[in-house]
Amino acid sequence: YIRGIKWIGNSVYPTDQLQRMFGVKAGDTYDKKTINKRLGYGKEDNPEDMSIKSLYQNNGYLMSQIEPAEIIIGADSIDMEMKIFEGKQFSINNVGISGNLRVNDEVIRRELYTLPGELYNRALLMQTIRQLAGMGHFDQEKIMPDIKPVSNELVDINWPLEEQASDQFNVAGGWGSGTFV
């Protein structure tokens, strides 16, 4: 079981807030899968993600990292140290769009939640992916932003889009009682 949890390196968020959000506490059974999920390791595209990593990334801390360390105490218990490297807050510098041949840039830009001058926000990035997929003009499986830091505090986001055929032509016919419909 977990004997204790210590947070190291957090200055942006207080320890009690991180502990509350983490949800694993002293006395709980050690479960690596749950711990990794609550820290934010694993599936990255979950829009409902309420992990510690998302907390930081939704507030501009793109390069934040959390390294859990397990210290074995006796035969049946461990202490955990959560080493947090917060880094600097990143703002969005430029937002580019490429690969769109039929859809006007302005139509696409209306769907973007990632705007120049705003703090990087992972949740808004995921919302933008859903909005672009909902347009029906682009291959949903290939909508993935290209995120490139351009300085210690600025990031460029490019949306390389691949259009899919959205034009349809349907012909239907039938017959009955000697007439053609």
Q: Each PLM stretch: what is its role?
A:
Residues 1-179:
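Periplasmic polypeptide-binding modules associated with outer-membrane biogenesis and secretion
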